[in-house]
Amino acid sequence: MRHAWLPYFDAVNAIIFLAPISCFDERLTEDPSVNRLEDTLLLWKAIVGSKLLGKITLIVFLNKCDLLKRKLQSGIMVNKYMISFGSRENEVGSVVKYLKDKFKDILRADASEPRTTYLYATSVTDTKATATTLNIVRDGIIREHLKHAEFV
């Protein structure tokens, strides 16, 4: 069903992809057999693999880092839910690095062509850091537009 919406993005210049990384231990409501983070990765794979979206700038927010931190501090082990996480340290920095690498690996393996991609770890409750990140993203999008218009 998700592939049905892809044609509506043909005139889009950028996609902001929100990936709630704190949901590594949760299941989809509509299908309890599916891990929410794995579902997010499958959706990412569909987006980067789409030829219709091949030239679009991708901006990924690995979001809800504050909730991730709380879960990890409470003793919830990532490798219990994501076997591929292995014996990495069960702390926010390790999880974020692992997931950034995972998103990049999917992009390299499945992208229809090379494209500009930005990855940021965010916590929307940290408004100062979020504002800074959004300003960086805005500046990047403006730079891309200027480059395509051959002003840069």
List PLM regions with ranges.
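A short, aliphatic-rich alpha-helical micro-motif
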Residues: 9-10
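Conserved GTP-binding G-domain of TRAFAC-class P-loop NTPases and closely related GTPase folds
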Residues: 14, 18-152
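Switch II (G3) loop of P-loop NTPases
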Residues: 1-5, 24-27
